[in-house]
C-alpha cells in the first residue's frame, strides 16, 4: 500500500481498508467506490477486527485469513504480511485461532501486524486498539466482557464534547478526573 493510499484509509477512519458491503457501525459517505468510511477511528478499527474475526470463525488459518484480506492479486506483500502477523501474534501461519477473549492479545497483535502494512507510519493509542478488539470479539462471540476503555477521555481523537479544565476546577467539583473534566456541551 502506498503512503497516499494509507493516508486515505486513515482519513476514512478505515485503517484496515475494509471493502464496502456490510452495514458497518458509524458509516459515513466515502470518497472511494471500493472502501467505506466511518465517523470515528474506533468504528473503523472495530470493523477491521470484525472482518478478521469473521474469517477466523469460518475455520481459516492465520495465513489463509491474510490471503483473503490482502490478496497478492491486489499487489499486496501478502507473504511479508503473513510473516509479520505470525511473529507478532505468536500464532503459526498454518494454525487456526479461536475467537475468544482468552486469545485477546493474539488477536490484537494479529491485527496490528496487518496495520503495519495497511496504515504504515500511523500508530493508534493502545487503549483505542484494546477497545476495538474487545468490541469485535464481543460482536463475534455474543459474550460481553468487562470494559477495556472506561475513560472516554482516552479515546482517539478525544471526543469534542470534552472541555479541558484545570486541576483546581476539577478539585472544586469534588472529583478528580486528571486533565479532562466531565463532558461539557460546547
Residue ranges and their predicted role:
Residues 1-186:
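Cell-wall polysaccharide-cleaving catalytic domain and substrate-binding groove, primarily
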